[in-house]
Amino acid sequence: RAKEVLLQALKLRPRNIQALKLLKIVYLKLRKYKENLELLGCLFELGENVKEEKEFLKALDFLASSLSDEEKKEHILKLQTDNNPMLGRFVFEKYHIFLNQDFSSICDLLYKENKAFNLQNKEYFEFFYALGLIEDEESKDVNFKNSNFKMLKILKENSFKARLEFSYRCTECKSVMPLFFYHCPVCYEFNTCQIIYEVKNNETY
């Protein structure tokens, strides 16, 4: 029903960007990825930056196809993940493949890891050190830049049941959600999910 209403609105006003974005969400829910890729072409013609989203939707289209799991993976890994944090996150979340993704785009997923990696990166190093996944002998005199990680490390060292709690804020409409989103469920924008974390001391943890 929503699809029919939006298509009618676009017949009356074909350059209605908001209606196109709403239709994009409807298509996503219906898993009509090919139609969505065509729709992104319309948004591009109207001046919208859709390059990253287009690659992301290609990944969803491959995932929904009748290809074998290995073929799906092969096609998805050929997509352009550089400078595309959402596609990079998708690859890590789906296949657990590290492609030097930005820490800020996958930190909540990293929280579930039980082995440290990419320690040449300061953010990764501090994070895994705070979680106790790096031996203290390997990291003497750590100078934390991230105050949350420093607090987490201190609390854990003093036998507090400290943890990180995550929430997700849309940088466009400022809505805060309890779960990660690739498209904001409120304003429908892509790649606007900012992962927020804070230290909590939870004795029931």
Model-derived features: positions:
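TPR alpha-solenoid repeat register
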Residues: A19, N36, E52-E53
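Structural motif corresponding to the intra-repeat A-B loop/turn of tetratricopeptide repeats
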Residues: L30, V50, S66-L67
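Alpha-helical repeat scaffolds
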Residues: A2-Q8, Y33-L46, D69-N83, D102-N121, ...
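Cys/His-clustered metal-coordination modules, chiefly Zn-binding fingers
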Residues: A116-Y205
